[in-house]
Amino acid sequence: MQVTETLNEGLKREIKVVVPAGDLEAKLAERLETARGRARINGFRPGKVPTAHLRKMYGKSFMAEIVNEILNDSSRSILAERNEKSATQPEVIMSEDEKEAEKVLDGKADFVFSLNYEVLPAIEVKDFSKIAVTREVVDISDEEVDEQVKRIASSTRTFETKKGKAENEDRVTIDYLGKLDGEPFEGGADNDAQLVLGSGQFIPGFEEQLIGLKAGDEKVITVTFPAEYGAAHLAGKEATFDIKVKEVAKPNELVLDDETAKKLGIESLERLRQVVREQIESQYGQITRQKVKRQILDALDGDYQFETPQKLVDAEFNNIWQQINFDLQQAGRTFEDEETTEEAAREEYRKLAERRVRLGLVLSEIGEKAGVEVTEEELQRAVYDQVRRYPGQEKEIYDFLRRTPDAVANLRAPIFEEKVVDHLLANINVTDKKVSKEELTAEDEDAASEAKPAKKAAAKKKAAPKKKAEEGKSEEA
């Protein structure tokens, strides 16, 4: 096999490979001889089938197998010999001339093909011990825990039918029918809907107009759907709702004790408080980690500038762009609504894709040099978590992952990345800073800009006045 480099520009490589017809013939002769000893053909004794007869019957199919084996093995062997790592699977380019292909299969012509690929750039890991980040820390007060406990426990609160007008925190049972320009709209009606006034369960302006109504009252209310509403056909529109109040119920006193905790599946009130505190700590911890991780990535972004494989960037950009357009479509928005143009958005997200690829390569190199590995247990846990996300389809998802190496690699990658971040955190300068929960949860402008408009679209409310109905309508948008 003759290997010749025909292109070496930046990360791009093109390798011409020539497998002489004589080499192909030698491989075919070896395969025919092996088959001769095993072949069972009518009219011939076992092991006595003439090679010429086997060649006539199986020569082309055997040669096709040989060619495929060469193609499958050549990429790996050539890259290994050249001490190169391909960013993606090398592209194989062969002659499309059918006559030429027939000559190769007949053993009368050399097999010639080319491998096109981009190599992974050589990255020299720099000293990262001088990277300094600030880790924001929030002290969780007992008052915050108690407030959250009350919010959770409110689901166990009972209500008692009352006479008189509905007040804030009362529960009303209503029938409603929504109309646009006097015509009912899909998803805008329900019977025996229960709503706790002041809960924010319905769209803004809806609940307030029910205060003061009594059982048996009927009223037509007018609301305006938010301009950034999830359903485009309702966004910014004025609608009316025919309301019939069927019951008004006042809340009984909310008692926080062990019995209330048990109704929530927790053995005691003290354990409930502990669980809630752990949940709050976890939520704040995730936000803190994301902010610290961004600081690390920004520092690495400044330290490492190199050419990135364009096919990797293309793939990353396509993933981002697909999600952006999906989110915009779901929200009924356009690039103009987001105060940009498609061209400008493409340029912005192309830069983001390049940054992600470059930082991914840097983290990969740092992790490899540090000996970071994803254990089988960690990978199995990720597989289990992924399967669990699809109730009723567990077997299908598991089988898909088992037979799709790329899907498993996609599960491995984020685990590896987080372990590399852990390695960096253990070796850089980290300064803790006490902040309020408002400061911690304040949206970072740079992070938000990366998500725009996907982040904005995802934050929109769905269609219909009730959250349950909103979820159903979101699938149509």
UniProtKB/Swiss-Prot annotation:
Residues 435-477 are annotated as: Disordered. Residues 454-466 have a biased composition (Basic residues). It is found in: Cytoplasm. Its EC number is 5.2.1.8. Keywords: Cell cycle, Cell division, Chaperone, Cytoplasm, Isomerase, Rotamase. GO terms for cellular component: cytoplasm. It is an enzyme of class 5 (isomerase). GO terms for biological process: 'de novo' cotranslational protein folding; cell division; chaperone-mediated protein folding; protein transport; protein unfolding. It catalyses: [protein]-peptidylproline (omega=180) = [protein]-peptidylproline (omega=0). Consists of 3 domains; the N-terminus binds the ribosome, the middle domain has PPIase activity, while the C-terminus has intrinsic chaperone activity on its own. NCBIfam families: tig. Belongs to the FKBP-type PPIase family. Tig subfamily. This is Trigger factor.
